[in-house]
Amino acid sequence: MKDKEVIIIGGGLAGLTSAIHLSKLGHSVTVIEKNTFPKHKVCGEYISNEVLPYLNWLNLNIAALNPTNITKLEFSTASGKTIKSILPLGGFGISRFALDEYLYRKAIRNGCTILQGQVENILYEDDKFTITTTNAVVLQSEMVIGAFGKRSNI
């Protein structure tokens, strides 16, 4: 059994961003992700420009991913009627494949450990979490972040 400072369960946007943030502050971080990287996710991603200062603080160069600038929103009905709205603050669109891979590589450059495996059990006892994966990895930590998404069965 290996003791870790911080364990993050889930290597999506929340998990990887948390890993980058904590590693920037000097913490030792281990991320457990059930899928391999790079990974496809059937969705696009809109990110508001209001988060740019935070992304800059994390030393993320999102411009290197060639995001699409988004300044308006348009809804349409099945009959073709539309409603349009300007987005004063604006934002950008980027593929999850590209963004997840970028965050994954940044977390590794920051010194994070990424383990591929699915969490099978979480036990909290004596102020410590014991995490067991389906491939028999057992880790312990006083700090665990659950970033496994809303559809997880954990």
Model features per residue range: what roles?
Residues M1-A14:
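Beta1/beta-strand and adjacent pyrophosphate-binding region of the FAD-binding site
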Residues K4, G26, S141-E142:
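Short, well-ordered alpha-helix to beta-strand connector turns
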Residues A14, S18-A19, S23, A107:
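Small-residue (primarily alanine) positions within well-ordered alpha-helices
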Residues S23-C43:
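Glycine-rich FAD pyrophosphate-binding loop
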Residues H27, L60, C112:
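Short phosphate-binding/catalytic loops that engage adenosine nucleotides
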Residues T36-L58:
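Conserved N-terminal glycine-rich FAD pyrophosphate-binding loop of Rossmann-like flavoproteins
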Residues V51-Y104, Y124:
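A conserved beta-strand/loop capping segment in the N-terminal third of enzymes
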Residues K106-I154:
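Predominantly flavin-linked oxidoreductase catalytic cores and closely associated redox partners
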